[in-house]
C-alpha cells in the first residue's frame, strides 16, 4: 500500500511545484515564440559573429571540434565550446544566420527560466516572474541574445557558477 501525504501542506507543496513548472514552461514558450522566428532575418554583421560562424562552419567541414580555425588556420582567440554548439546547430538547420544565432536564443530561454527560479527561491513566485520579465524586456541582453557571439553563453555559465557557489555554501 502506498501512502501519500494529504492535507493543506501537501496540497500547497504540490500546487507550488506545479505552478513553478507551469511558470517555467510559460516563460520558455513566450521567450521562444517571441525570439526564435526572426533570428535569421538579418545577415551576420559583427566581426565576432562572423568569425564564430565561420569557425563553426569549418568545424563541420574538418570534423575538428577542439581546435578552432578561421580560413583553415589556427584561431586561438576564443574557446571552442560556443563554436561547437553553433556547429551542432548548423548540422541540424544548415549553415546560415539562423543556425549561428539559435544557440543564444536557447541560452536566453535558459537564462530567463533560471532567473525566474532563482527569484522564486530567494523571494517568492511573483518576484521571480517580475525579475524574468524585467530581464527579458531589457535592451542590452536582448541585443546580445539576438546575436551569434559568445557573451550570452559566457554570462549564463558565470551566473550558474555564482548561483551554484551560494547553493553549496548554504
Range-by-range predicted roles:
Residues 2-170:
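Membrane-integral, polyisoprenol-dependent glycosyltransferases
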Amino acid at each position: 500500500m502506498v501512502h501519500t501525504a494529504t492535507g493543506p501542506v501537501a496540497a500547497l507543496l504540490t500546487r507550488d511545484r506545479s505552478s513553478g513548472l507551469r511558470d517555467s514552461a510559460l516563460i520558455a514558450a513566450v521567450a521562444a515564440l517571441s525570439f526564435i522566428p526572426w533570428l535569421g532575418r538579418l545577415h551576420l554583421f559583427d566581426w565576432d559573429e562572423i568569425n564564430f560562424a565561420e569557425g563553426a562552419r569549418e568545424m563541420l567541414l574538418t570534423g575538428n571540434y577542439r581546435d578552432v580555425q578561421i580560413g583553415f588556420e589556427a584561431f586561438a582567440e576564443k574557446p571552442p565550446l560556443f563554436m561547437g554548439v553553433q556547429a551542432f546547430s548548423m548540422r541540424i538547420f544548415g549553415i546560415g544566420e539562423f543556425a549561428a544565432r539559435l544557440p543564444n536564443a536557447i541560452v536566453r530561454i535558459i537564462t530567463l527560466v533560471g532567473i525566474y527560479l532563482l527569484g522564486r527561491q530567494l523571494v517568492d513566485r511573483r518576484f521571480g516572474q517580475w525579475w524574468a520579465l524585467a530581464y527579458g524586456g531589457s535592451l542590452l541582453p536582448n541585443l546580445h541574445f539576438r546575436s551569434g557571439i559568445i557573451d550570452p553563453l559566457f554570462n549564463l555559465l558565470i551566473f550558474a557558477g555564482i548561483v551554484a557557489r551560494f547553493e553549496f555554501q548554504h
